[in-house]
Curated annotation (Swiss-Prot):
Organism placement in taxonomy: Bacteria, Bacillati, Bacillota, Clostridia, Eubacteriales
Recorded name of the encoding gene: hfq
Protein name, UniProt field: RNA-binding protein Hfq
All copies of domain Sm, residue ranges: 10-70
UniProt similarity note: Belongs to the Hfq family.
One Pfam family named in its UniProt record: Hfq
Gene source species: Desulforamulus reducens (strain ATCC BAA-1160 / DSM 100696 / MI-1)
């Protein structure tokens, strides 16, 4: 059997979406967007900010910074 491929990006985005964790998205041009992730696919992230929805293309994103730590199944502390 093959191991399932770990998709950390999807796990992270899904967790901030499900837990309504506010995020700051830093774009490659230096611009910052603050809001809540409402959805995502392979190419875009839907961000709700100030009552508006923004579709942000992933290729324009440099960093996504959550307001608080995100617990994904891949980042849990496991004994060595």
């Amino acid at each position: 059997m093959t191991k399932p491929q770990i998709n950390l990006q999807d796990a992270f985005l899904n967790q901030v979406r499900k837990e309504n964790i506010p995020v700051t998205i830093f774009l490659i041009n230096g611009f910052q967007l603050k809001g809540m992730v409402k959805g995502f696919d392979n190419f875009t992230v839907i961000l709700e900010s100030d009552g508006k929805q923004l579709m942000v293309y992933k290729h324009a994103i440099s960093t996504i910074s959550p307001l608080r730590p995100v617990n994904t199944s891949f980042s849990e502390n496991k004994p060595i």
